[in-house]
Design a protein with these regions (language model features):
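Phosphate-binding site recognition
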Residues: 1-138
Length: 138
C-alpha cells in the first residue's frame, strides 16, 4: 500500500505535464520509500526504469541497455550499447517523438562505476534540452 507522499507525487506530475525536458532528483535516507515513490509515479506512463547496482560499469551498462531495448522493442535481449553515452543519447532521441520518463534508481552506484557518467549526462542535457520531451529522474 502506498501512503503519503502526495506532495512529492504532485510535484512530479506537474513536471511530467510540462511536456518538455524536465529533471528531478529524489533523495533521502535509505529505506524511506524513494523507490516506491518512483514506481507509483511511473504507473501508466511510458517509462524506462533502471536500478543501478553496486558493481562495475560493464554490468550496469548491460542492465541499462536491457531496460532501454525492452522498452523500445518489447523484446528481452542480451544486446548492449557500447557506452552510457550511446545508451543515453538513444533515450533522448526516443523522447523527441513522445513524452518519456527515464528513472535511474540508485544513481550513485552507477555514477561510482562510471566516472564520466555525470559529465556525459550534462553534455546530453545541454544538447537535447530544447528538443527532447524526456523527464529524467535520478
Amino acid at each position: 500500500m502506498f501512503i503519503g507522499r502526495e506532495r512529492e507525487l504532485n510535484a512530479l506530475e506537474k513536471l511530467y505535464t510540462s511536456n518538455r525536458f524536465e529533471f528531478a532528483v529524489i533523495y533521502g535516507r535509505r529505506r524511506v520509500g524513494k523507490t516506491a515513490l518512483i514506481n507509483q509515479f511511473l504507473g501508466g506512463k511510458k517509462a524506462i526504469y533502471f536500478m543501478g547496482i553496486e558493481s562495475n560499469a560493464k554490468q550496469n551498462l548491460e542492465n541499462f541497455s536491457k531496460s532501454i531495448i525492452e522498452y523500445s522493442s518489447g523484446i528481452e535481449t542480451e544486446t548492449s550499447f557500447l557506452s552510457f553515452q550511446a545508451a543515453l543519447e538513444y533515450v533522448f532521441k526516443l523522447a523527441e517523438k513522445e513524452r518519456l520518463v527515464l528513472a535511474i534508481d540508485e544513481y550513485p552506484y552507477v555514477a561510482r562505476s562510471s566516472k564520466s557518467l555525470a559529465s556525459t549526462l550534462q553534455l546530453l542535457i545541454d544538447k537535447y534540452k530544447d528538443s527532447s520531451k524526456l523527464m529524467l529522474i535520478l
